[in-house]
């Protein structure tokens, strides 16, 4: 609702040059659940954000939003620089997380004991531990929906956040927020690239 005011504050009061919006997702465990955005809200937010970022660029502001910047690089460079939004969830593949006891998890957002990949005290290599976990842990289930079949953004998304799905017991389902963000941001980015506003 206050995208412009938030960006004005970050750019002109705090003099930030970059930031990243992480949208609150539907989450049964979080008291902030009423702050969660749903598909129509995500489309509105993404379009407002893109409009304001374009306006700030026209005013000469040196400011970027991290999720949009990564998606632009996905299109322009295929750099796969984000382990979350460049080629689907890469938790356990391009990143792992450790707890205070040396247990290894596929992502810092997941701590279910059944999702543990292994331990730093095991003799197996991380590759062997991940391969074993990928055969049995729900975190690694592929995510697909009927609309994914012909989605032009599937390469980048691949169903979205696996941790979110585990917390909501939606294993194998897509992350609706990530899907809506991709369907709203990528077409706008292509338009901006074709108009010469992003290079």
Predicted segments with their positions:
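Generic detector of isolated residues embedded in canonical secondary-structure elements
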Residues: 18, 48, 101, 147-150, ...
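Flexible mid-to-C-terminal extensions adjoining Fe-S/redox cofactors in radical SAM and related proteins
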Residues: 111-199
